[in-house]
């Protein structure tokens, strides 16, 4: 599936990337999620921006993790309800996330 301008979705992890992420510890995954959530706000932000900033912050602590995996972690956080999304999360350049909005009291 392509976007209107022919953009392909984010590719799956290749073998080397899959091997790298399979070695991440639970603590590293928690740190990655913490940093991703810290980059989010109550206004929608591009997933690519959040991913890029998180990579920059964690490169010294958790090196060689591909951006595609960070985007997968963002999708995971959306599934857990820790982030809200708009757009197709399979296209990190064309999707946005934010922290959950407080639901109004009825």
Task: Indicate residue ranges for each PLM-predicted region.
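Short amphipathic alpha-helical interaction segments
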Residues: 62-79
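A short, conserved structural fragment
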Residues: 78-89
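Short acidic, hydrophobic short linear motifs in intrinsically disordered regions
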Residues: 43-65
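Eukaryotic, polar/proline-rich low-complexity intrinsically disordered regions
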Residues: 2-6, 42, 46, 105-106
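Short, cationic-aromatic polyanion-contact patches
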Residues: 88-106
């Amino acid at each position: 599936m392509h976007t209107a301008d022919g953009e392909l979705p984010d590719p799956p992890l290749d073998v080397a990337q899959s091997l790298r992420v399979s070695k991440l510890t639970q603590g590293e995954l928690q740190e990655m999620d913490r940093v991703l959530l810290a980059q989010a706000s109550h206004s929608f932000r591009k997933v690519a921006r959040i991913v890029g900033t998180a990579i920059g912050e964690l490169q010294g602590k958790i090196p060689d993790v591909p951006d595609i995996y960070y985007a997968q972690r963002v999708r995971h956080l959306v599934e857990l309800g820790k982030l809200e999304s708009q757009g197709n999360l399979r296209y990190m350049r064309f999707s946005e996330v934010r922290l959950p909005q407080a639901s109004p009291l009825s």
